[in-house]
């Protein structure tokens, strides 16, 4: 049993901040700097070369990423962002999709089967919580970090949709997941079949309440 061999809750808290990328093994001191360099390379080099992004919009893409990091929760208003950044609404959606393909962001839709080419996502997360801590130091909302981890882990081999009124996420069109801390109760998912709570301050499964760190075993 995992809990007999280590302290998963304590280790999980460390992992949310540092642990996603293997270059952590080269030393913790430069870990966040390496992440920033990686993101800048994607934005400044790969997007213009591969996706033909206008280099004059690079700073706007950087600002868009910063917005995703800082807003809690980040539910997309593409028209508002387009107006603020002085670019087209479709361009905003296009850039988000590029960043999703580059594994900088995870884009969630309330109904993935009906997503069109220029459909805006309902909710946007950084691809993993380490990006939050690297790009928005001192401002990370723990709820956002939890959800970012959950989406990142589940998306490897499952379909994840924005839950809207029923839970945080709908998984594979069947399961309803609510993400939270130790005190999270069943009020938002009461009476919903195949619904579960994943809590980060939780050691072992208790009925339909499961440790959030267990999702890390999915990949």
Predicted regions and their residues:
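Interdomain hinge/linker elements that couple catalytic modules in large macromolecular machines
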Residues: 1-133
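A cross-kingdom feature that marks ATP-driven nucleic-acid transaction machinery
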Residues: 97, 103-219
């Amino acid at each position: 049993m995992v809990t007999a061999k280590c302290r998963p809750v304590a280790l999980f808290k460390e992992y949310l901040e540092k642990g996603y990328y293997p270059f952590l093994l080269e030393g913790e001191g430069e870990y966040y700097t390496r992440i920033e360099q990686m993101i800048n390379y994607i934005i400044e080099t790969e997007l213009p070369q591969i996706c033909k992004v206008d280099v004059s919009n690079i700073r706007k893409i950087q600002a868009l990423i910063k917005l995703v990091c800082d807003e809690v929760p980040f539910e997309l208003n593409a028209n508002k962002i387009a107006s603020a950044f002085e670019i087209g609404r479709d361009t905003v959606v296009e850039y988000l999709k590029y960043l999703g393909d580059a594994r900088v962001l995870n884009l969630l839709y309330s109904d993935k089967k009906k997503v069109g080419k220029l459909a805006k996502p309902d909710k946007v997360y950084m691809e993993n919580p380490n990006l939050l801590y690297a790009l928005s130091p001192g401002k990370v909302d723990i709820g956002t970090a939890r959800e970012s981890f959950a989406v990142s882990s589940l998306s490897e081999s499952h379909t994840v949709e924005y839950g809207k009124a029923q839970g945080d996420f709908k998984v594979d069109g069947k399961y309803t997941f609510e993400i939270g801390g130790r005190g999270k109760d069943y009020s938002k998912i009461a009476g919903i079949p195949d619904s579960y709570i994943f809590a980060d301050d939780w050691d072992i499964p208790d009925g339909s309440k499961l440790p959030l760190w267990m999702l890390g075993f999915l990949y």
